[in-house]
């Protein structure tokens, strides 16, 4: 506990009474200020979520998909991160980080807005030339966010930049666009990458049929979709029974909230604790 005042002996009752009154008054003002800031933060988080959802929905529509993919990525990202935080403190994440990564995950493919529609929605396998063009969506998305100069200090924007550019990197360095290896890849991009691959496997696309849940897990674990962080594979195996349930529940609600019901940033302030080829 902090000390806001002290009284020297001998005590004067009138002085004690006034000091107590001042302390109570100061505390009330502090609480009012905390509630005001918390309310502003909550409004900002809400506005961020609305804008992210709008932008990701635009990309999904152009990509010939519903918002289901974005929703699923957010849910999978959040439950993977929760499990990861329970297993290790290696990445020094807070609940605020978890919420921001889950929200930013909705922008992972925003760069596809710069890819030709004929390539995005081609029902056959892409040619090598088309595939090279498709791969550019990572850098396009990153560049779009980099151009938001006035928002570069925003944690949400920085995380979204990481995810956009590096969500197709692989743990063994065989991904793109930069061939990053291991934990050179930000954990935000690692988790979204795994969530993206799982959802791409288990859902129908214009060029492929959906793969059953168990088969998708097997393909990921055995490295058929590229190598992932062994810790994340452990997390995936530990939550694999919950994944279909979580996604089905979200589908019934027809919505998802990356911040969940527990806005940790605001709650913390109020408590003052404070390839898919």
Residue ranges and their predicted role:
Residues 15-29:
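Receiver (REC) domain switch/output surface
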Residues 27, 31-34, 38-52, 99:
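Signal-transmission coiled-coil "S-helix" linker that connects upstream sensory/regulatory modules
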Residues 48-64:
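Conserved HAMP-HisKA connector
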